[in-house]
């Protein structure tokens, strides 16, 4: 071993030797000071993008609503980065988007001004690490503003967990998706090209090794963060499998997201009338405009299915009801519109961005088929809602839809799964060709299968877990 390597190891050991007591010296006063500031009977949700209007926000508002009813003697807070929205505006959006009414007298918003730090656009390289560290900074801002008795990370900022554990708060994690998963490690190790593993890296031995090392080190950090939670909850089987593996804990419970099944069951579908009277096959995609949602595949499917449907005597339309959170999402919409122009499908494409709840209900009532294309969707609230609303679901054959939702019920088909563009096109044609009776059978058993995803089930399981820390 060279003198340089020995010197480097020696310096590293010395650095650690001095750092450990320094960290301990900082932690002790931090914990003591936090104890003086901690407010009893307070529950705070760390959800910097609480006004985004996605599935994660449905969980947030439903959780607060059920806790307001079950534990009215506690006070509820939300750490929010939506500094441009008032409390009234945020609660109004929760009601309009999800139909969820909250008691405004028992909820306060604590505004965080450093939210921009966690946005991926700032970090072109080592994005996960820098976002995690930025999340820690944001958590420290939250800590500075208030230390609650119970801290709930409902959005997935792992380093917020040890920060509030050290402050003496009871810590709860509700994980929608793992920051890093076994699948991500496998993709890099097998050198597959995906949206988060570029061809440049996949084709290079050195870069693949470097990224795999980085992922493994980050997985260790994620493991440490996960150990800080007193209670761990996940949204489905896929997420549970990865979290139990990476966090090395077996006490992580599945609490399915609250799907407003009853409300969607009451939607009166007019899809068959549209099919019969106007010869229109209406497709619907519901989901935020994010890269992993793979809207580009939906456009390609629309392009490829258009001609064979026309030969069968049908028109086809695709409505994309997507949530746009920021400028990055708006840019993706522009790119998708340009792609639609190239594919000559703009006339068949309908955009409904940041759609209110009432308008979403209308779109669901008109849709014959709901199309979902995200690979390894962690759960899939939109999939459940689509099935409840009597649309025929065509989902990606992976993640939560495959493991939890689109599974035969009492031996009967409840929907369809596909992976490739060709499979999606083939399945759409099959659904149209199979006839009204078969489609109605699929709808009937799909709707029967959804009781386990209702709001009542969510409230029961959520309160059971939360009681452990109250």
UniProtKB/Swiss-Prot annotation:
Q: Where are the Lumenal topological domains? A: 1-15
An annotated GO cellular component: endoplasmic reticulum membrane
List its EC numbers: 2.4.1.131
| Predominant location | endoplasmic reticulum
One term of GO molecular function: GDP-Man:Man3GlcNAc2-PP-Dol alpha-1,2-mannosyltransferase activity
- What are the UniProt keywords, alphabetically? Endoplasmic reticulum, Glycosyltransferase, Membrane, Transferase, Transmembrane, Transmembrane helix
| Gene Ontology terms: biological process | dolichol-linked oligosaccharide biosynthetic process; protein N-linked glycosylation
A Pfam family matched in the record? Glycos_transf_1
Which segments of the protein form a coiled coil according to its record? none
- Which residue ranges are intramembrane, renumbered to this chain? 132-152, 379-399
Keyword Transmembrane attached? yes
Segments spanning the bilayer are 16-36
Cytoplasmic-side stretches of the chain, per the record, are 37-131, 153-378, 400-470
What is this protein for, i.e. what is its function? GDP-Man:Man(3)GlcNAc(2)-PP-Dol alpha-1,2-mannosyltransferase that operates in the biosynthetic pathway of dolichol-linked oligosaccharides, the glycan precursors employed in protein asparagine (N)-glycosylation. The assembly of dolichol-linked oligosaccharides begins on the cytosolic side of the endoplasmic reticulum membrane and finishes in its lumen. The sequential addition of sugars to dolichol pyrophosphate produces dolichol-linked oligosaccharides containing fourteen sugars, including two GlcNAcs, nine mannoses and three glucoses.
This chain's protein is named: GDP-Man:Man(3)GlcNAc(2)-PP-Dol alpha-1,2-mannosyltransferase
**Organism, scientific name:** Caenorhabditis elegans
